[in-house]
From Swiss-Prot:
It holds the Pfam family zf-tcix. PANTHER family: C2ORF42 HOMOLOG, PUTATIVE TREBLE-CLEF ZINC-FINGER C2ORF42 FAMILY MEMBER. It comes from the Eukaryota. Residues 297-317 are annotated as: Disordered. GO terms for cellular component: nucleoplasm. InterPro entries: C2orf42, Zf-tcix. This is Uncharacterized protein C2orf42 homolog.
């Protein structure tokens, strides 16, 4: 009776329309809600999938400055003739040119640039283009800066990949040449890489695209500049798809390190076919084990065709931080697995075993190296107070072993002094052993650790108020461009203002007679029952300005200047 009653409600002039079709509507690939084909986003508010951007979409950013951590000025510039997703690199700098005049020689600074688009490089070498190309002009007027993405070491350590891959990622992330991953546009990232003939600056572009089709699941596309672009119509089976490069995993680790990015790029983190099964982001909190049990229970259930994406998000929920997983579960309407109270008590009430809390010698030595780095500041005079450490005897034995590396026997101290301490604690008679190191390479060999290599020089920039700020200097060796671009190499070297401090060890100037020592002093048994001794490190450092030794200048104003106070006035009340 009900179907007949519904048919009677149809007006007579619509009775001959025929069978209903799906013309003009389409299903949302994520939640299955029917939407109009002209719709920009899903009308299901809990879904919010964006189908396409409207006509008022903001244009792609023309030029973005890359954070290099040095004086090197690198820009990511859009190639207008190729589309919004094609970008290139431009390097800007300042070069000094001497001009001979009647009055003498005038040294002027000229802004110059180098565009790394092959066509622009070729045109510059052949002398076809006299003025700057359009990419350099865009870089000169650039005011936008890339957004650095944080990479958590816990995420990188949890990456179930080859040790070589993790080691390469860690080396790139710890190099003082800016962040590992930077966001240039919504879909394009700039990733650090090893400098090569193809990537001279040590950076490349990586893009994450998502093409949504009305008849199938979203198609996720990743392209990296280190890969060769396949023909558009070539069909490559999923089983034969090329493995993802190291830059792809670098971006995913950066996405998983931030909750907002993990939600935005959850499709890439959750996608099984892209080879992300091996990436696991560690969870923090009491419900870490419950999330694992949820994954196992979801994986044990058979997957249905209509719930492919829901089950996929459930299986790979370990790819995202816990909050992101919870938000996805709320959106999809799934119930969280029940966690028994005994499990909660076991996870939350787990006590820290004090016997397992240890500090290795290399971790301690890395802290010493970091103290030396902090002390070598351009704003101070280069003669710091001794660095004092209280360490066990075993740590100093390991340090003394490093001091003796290269010699057949244990190196004896340069001097041994016995002294009586009466004016300060602890009181008593102590022995002090002193080593003088006059070779900078030996100092670096003693203090180098995998986590914290010793930096012999440190770079700084001067602020407007006269203070100085640390500016990490790059160590990227840019290989020569092809021989066909030989004329570019003959351009003057770009040398911006350089402010550096350097460790004074040995003879640092031609007229120096006595070498400057790096002094290590050891006083054992300051705490005799605990076997703790006192280690003192004394050193000096100098200042460089544009490659020349500069005298220290105190940026602070002198305190002996009299203050000028306005005269007081007498106010009379009527």
């Amino acid at each position: 009776m009900e179907p007949n009653s519904q048919r009677t409600k149809v007006p007579a002039f619509l009775s001959d329309l025929g069978k209903a079709t799906l013309r003009g509507i389409r299903k949302c690939p994520r939640c299955g809600t029917f939407n109009g084909t002209r719709g920009l986003s899903c009308k299901n508010k809990t879904c919010g999938t964006i189908f396409r951007y409207g006509a008022r979409k903001q244009p792609s950013i023309e030029a973005v400055k890359i954070i290099t951590g040095s004086d090197l000025q690198v820009y990511s510039v859009r190639q207008r003739d190729r589309g919004p997703d094609y970008r290139c690199f431009v390097e800007l700098g300042v070069s000094e040119t001497a001009i001979q005049t009647v009055d003498g020689t005038i040294i002027t600074q000229l802004s110059s640039g180098r565009c790394y688009v092959p066509s622009c490089l070729k045109a510059a070498t052949q002398g076809i283009v006299e003025n700057q190309c359009q990419h350099i002009k865009l870089a000169v007027t650039c005011q936008a800066e890339a957004t650095p993405l944080t990479l958590k070491s816990s995420v990188l350590n949890a990456l179930q990949a080859a040790p070589e891959t993790k080691q390469s990622l860690w080396q790139l992330a710890t190099e003082p040449t800016g962040p590992l991953v930077q966001r240039v546009t919504k879909n394009i990232m700039v990733v650090k890489c090893k400098a090569s003939q193809k990537h001279n600056l040590g950076y490349l572009h990586a893009s994450f695209m998502q093409k949504i089709s009305s008849r199938s699941l979203p198609e996720r596309r990743f392209f990296c500049s280190c890969q060769t672009l396949r023909p558009h119509k070539s069909s490559v089976p999923k089983a034969e798809a090329a493995p993802k490069c190291i830059h792809f995993f670098a971006c995913l680790c950066a996405f998983a390190s931030d909750e907002t990015l993990a939600q935005e790029f959850s499709d890439f983190l959750n996608f099984d076919a892209s080879g992300l099964k091996e990436i696991i982001v560690p969870h923090l909190g009491c419900h870490a084990e419950s999330s694992v049990s949820a994954c196992e229970s979801a994986a044990s259930k058979p997957r249905k065709r209509k719930k492919d994406e829901v089950s996929g998000a459930q299986v790979n929920s370990s790819l995202m931080p816990q909050d992101a997983v919870n938000s996805n579960l709320r959106k999809s309407g799934l119930k969280r697995p029940v966690v028994t109270s005994s499990l909660k008590r076991h996870v939350c009430g787990q006590l820290l075993d004090e016997a397992q809390v240890t500090l290795s010698f290399q971790d301690w030595l890395a802290s010493v190296t970091e103290r030396i780095h902090q002390t070598m500041h351009y704003q101070f005079d280069g003669k710091p107070e001794p660095l004092v450490f209280h360490i066990p005897q075993s740590f100093f034995d390991a340090l003394q072993q490093r001091i003796s590396i290269g010699s057949a026997k244990k190196r004896l101290p340069n001097s041994t002094t016995a002294f009586v301490r009466k004016d300060a604690l602890p009181l008593g008679t102590f022995s002090k052993y002193t080593w003088h190191i006059t070779n900078i390479l030996q100092v670096k060999q003693i203090l180098d650790t995998p986590e914290m290599p010793l930096e012999i020089t440190r770079s700084f920039i001067q602020n407007r108020d006269g203070t100085y700020e640390l500016f990490k200097c790059p160590k990227v060796e840019v290989e020569n461009i092809a021989e066909s671009y030989g004329r570019i190499e003959k351009q003057p070297v770009l040398r911006p203002l350089e402010l550096k401090t350097f460790l004074k060890v040995g003879n640092t100037s031609p007229d120096q007679k006595e070498p400057t020592p790096f002094i290590i002093e050891w006083i054992p048994d300051i705490l005799p029952q605990s076997k703790i001794g006192e280690l003192r490190i004394k050193f000096e450092y100098g200042h460089h300005r544009n490659g020349h030794v500069a005298d220290y200048q105190d940026p602070r104003p002198p305190m002996d200047q009299p203050l000028e106070l306005a005269p007081l006035t007498t106010i009379t009340f009527p």
